[in-house]
């Protein structure tokens, strides 16, 4: 029997590795599009700044073809290079397009009409067509310029430092657009705005040279549609990773942004490794995890075997990225997500409620994390030289803090199927903060009376900022999943007209409060005995701040 199990383990591992081709093998050649890339052989800052604006206009032009935008993007990312001719050779490695270099001496005064070098393979009709494309901006671009400030294009640029500041400000916006171009391109641009603010604070991005949001979106769309550009950017990212501490500004900037791009599309895999294997807690010994642990082992070997480009599987559209999908290890993924929601507040920004998420193992992860937060790693404790008394003190400290934040109080399981912003938020984070007041628009008819006989509000689950708590289970399938682990959830009243408190806006909800009989909604009484009546004219101030960043 042991030989069969060993054979199964080898089979699982080899199944992930056997379909890889030899490194550097050339794929069968397909039809290639001709891409014209412009090269400037002089360091003239005026000419390069005009080329920067010309490329931005070609990318944003409403009638430009895909090959025009690809050539403009490669030219744009090559402008800081002292030798553009050599730098563009990075794009020659792509099997997707045929790169044609066109050497440019400059532009005709006051226009975007190219002045080609004698060696450039450009006809008069192509030069005229490029000039028309540069002036053909869509109506969604305001003031006839891609920049927010209309006078930026016409400003003189006669110093190398001026050109580099403007060029880096534009390129850093283009690189930020690369971060989400393959994984969440249609999501709100909150993360991009935060990164822009970061680089402005660092002095890498000058606010005066900000592009319009529509221009940024068009750049992101062009990058998303072009595998040639993304392969070129991958080579740039690899060059930036190899740089030492003494590097130029451009590759230091690319290396910084590369941290946001690396391993995109592999978040589920790395979170599973972090919260399931990294914690090394006892549920890993469950027999149900045995096969999936072998799967994770084979995936780790596959990732190491892919080499340096494994970090950019999503950017390269590599088919191997499908091997890392969490659908291949759903049970241990569910367990890891349960652990992560308790340990890491940033997990609330990650959509882990997949169709294959198992509610039982998610709750096992939640309960394990809550109970094991105070455990001590004996090996680390031995390295630190902790005595048994010190280890006990650390455990008691964590347990005491966890109890103060409401851990372990019954009130229902964490519901992974409800988005975090819709789940009920804690009434009080610490014991010295009073409970929140009832909503002003609750519509109760009890005249604002408190709980009967002066009773306090019934105890409900209160969690810290890492705690995602459930709403009453309406779905019978979900109720079936969670009921065995939390039988007390059936005691929570299930009314259709729940009274909801608002915290800082419409999307924040407080816990529901009921009287001691659980049959009607009454006024909430704070932990210090103060009653919050249902009076629309009385607005007590909450002491709990927003839960969103």
Curated annotation (Swiss-Prot):
Biological role: Forms the helical nucleocapsid (NC) with 12.71 N subunits per helical turn and a rise of 5.3 Angstrom per N subunit, protecting the genome from nucleases. The encapsidated genomic RNA serves as template for transcription and replication; encapsidation by N is coupled to RNA synthesis. Forms the encapsidation complex with the phosphoprotein protein P. Before encapsidation, the newly synthesized free N protein, so-called N0, is chaperoned by P.
Domain remark from Swiss-Prot or TrEMBL: Ncore is globular and carries the regions required for self-assembly and RNA-binding. Ntail is an intrinsically disordered monomeric domain in the C-terminus.
Comp. bias intervals (Acidic residues): 437-447
Subcellular location: Virion; Host cytoplasm
Biased composition (Polar residues): 531-549
GO MF: RNA binding; structural molecule activity
Modified residues (Phosphoserine): 439
Listed GO CC annotations: helical viral capsid; host cell cytoplasm; ribonucleoprotein complex; viral nucleocapsid
Name of the featured protein: Nucleoprotein
This protein's UniProt keywords: Capsid protein, Helical capsid protein, Host cytoplasm, Phosphoprotein, Ribonucleoprotein, RNA-binding, Viral nucleoprotein, Virion
Lineage summary: Viruses, Riboviria, Orthornavirae, Negarnaviricota, Haploviricotina
Disordered, as annotated region: 437-469, 517-549
Similarity section: Belongs to the paramyxoviruses nucleocapsid family.
Subunit structure: Homomultimer; forms the nucleocapsid. Binds to the viral genomic RNA. N0 interacts with the phosphoprotein (via N-terminus); this interaction allows P to chaperon N0 to avoid N polymerization before encapsidation. Interacts (via N-terminus) as N-RNA template with the phosphoprotein (via C-terminus); this interaction positions the polymerase on the template.
